[in-house]
């Protein structure tokens, strides 16, 4: 079973993302800030990470950069899911190492398609 790590400081967003993934075969892991997300990614080695950008303790951009420096996590697909859709933010996301960048609110169908695409399904 493939694992998906959801990283967002909003309990509501985490709940909505978990509900969207409920009908999928993925095991879902959650973290409520970037620092915890990095720790869980290193420990759990998920197959994919959905990462918010603006979070306490560590931004999604910084978390992404750190994950790209770690041998165990440097190739894990990371999809940034954020309200920050300005071109400068999108560019920073890709420079930090994300593999895809989508803006909230995101349609459940679109989210699932992005996951399947990144997981090669």
Which residues are covered by each model-predicted region?
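Active-site beta3 strand of CheY-like receiver
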Residues: 44-50
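Short hydrophobic/Thr-rich beta-strand motif most characteristic of the beta2 strand and flanking loop
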Residues: 25-32, 40, 102
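Receiver (REC) domain active-site loop signature in two-component systems and cognate sites
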Residues: 55
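C-terminal output helix
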Residues: 106-115
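Charged docking surfaces used in two-component/phosphorelay signaling
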Residues: 15-23, 113
